[in-house]
Amino acid sequence: MRRYLIVAHKTLGGDHLIDHVRSLREEGPCRFLLLVPVQHPADHMWTEGEVTAAARRKLQEGLDRFHDEGIIADGEIGDANPVYAVSTVVRREGSGAFDGIVLSTLPPGPSRWLHLDVPSRMRREHPELPITHLVADRVAAH
């Protein structure tokens, strides 16, 4: 069974991502690991406990949406640096554990990850894995 690593935060559970996962499932059975990097807000003070709890809530919302759609998924939270978070998972699981990585971001402008060039950095860090970059048209409401 094919397995994909999905990396998202604000866009997790968005229709664009669910549609892509459905298209992957049309090609054959697959399962997914959702990785939600913690987010450090720039507009207010925060504690590590607060951002971890927020990431856990976002992960649970994503898992609930995937399960509601009949999609087999597990999940975890990761480091605030999404490239490092992915590298940690790939190192732990082994690069052969995944058939690909799906990275979901906000559009240019509001996307901090695009500003940091995360898609290109992730491709350089993991050339052995195909990386699909999806851009949401808005923050997931689910």
Where are these regions (language model features)?
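Small/aliphatic-rich secondary-structure junction motif
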Residues: 1-47, 125, 133-136
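Acidic/glycine-enriched edge-of-secondary-structure segments
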Residues: 2-8, 61-80
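Glycine- and acidic-residue-enriched helix-capping/strand-helix junction motifs
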Residues: 46-56
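Structural beta-alpha unit
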Residues: 70-98
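Glycine-rich, aromatic-bearing surface loops/beta-hairpins
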Residues: 100, 125-142
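Glycine-rich, Arg-bearing micro-motifs that act as flexible, cationic patches
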Residues: 104-120
